[in-house]
């Protein structure tokens, strides 16, 4: 499995403010390919802050967003939400990287991001859900 992984703790300067903004949004977008609910695409200050941090993490001058995908949105999976193995990146034409930023204080133990080579294999990588942690893969 040839997969890169970047884990950045304390990713946002003011995660409590971003979380507060996120909780004020409507979560009504249901997608059959991913669990939970999502908001519409974000932009503005949050996008600028995330882009700046990602440029440093990846050592690049520009971030090219794949706007055909669910880019820069908040997702909510409440307790009891069914989750399953799914693909966040569908191929080279739809983005080389995906990322999750955790903004839940005191998350459920054993929650986080798991990476599988395929549905037929065991999990290759597990990264815990830690408040203000970005996981890029």
Give the predicted meaning of each segment.
Residues 1-137:
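Fe(II)/2-oxoglutarate oxygenase catalytic core
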């Amino acid at each position: 499995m040839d997969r890169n992984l970047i884990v950045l703790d304390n990713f946002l300067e003011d995660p409590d403010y971003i979380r507060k903004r996120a909780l004020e949004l409507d979560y009504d977008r249901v997608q059959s390919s991913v669990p939970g609910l999502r908001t519409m695409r974000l932009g503005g200050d949050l996008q600028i802050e995330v882009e700046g941090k990602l440029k440093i993490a990846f050592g690049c001058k520009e971030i090219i967003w794949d706007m055909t995908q669910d880019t820069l949105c908040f997702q909510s999976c409440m307790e009891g939400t069914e989750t399953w193995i799914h693909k966040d990146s569908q191929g080279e034409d739809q983005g080389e990287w995906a990322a999750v930023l955790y903004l839940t204080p005191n998350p459920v133990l054993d929650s986080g991001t798991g990476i599988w080579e395929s549905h037929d294999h065991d999990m290759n990588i597990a990264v815990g859900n830690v408040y203000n942690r970005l996981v890029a893969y």
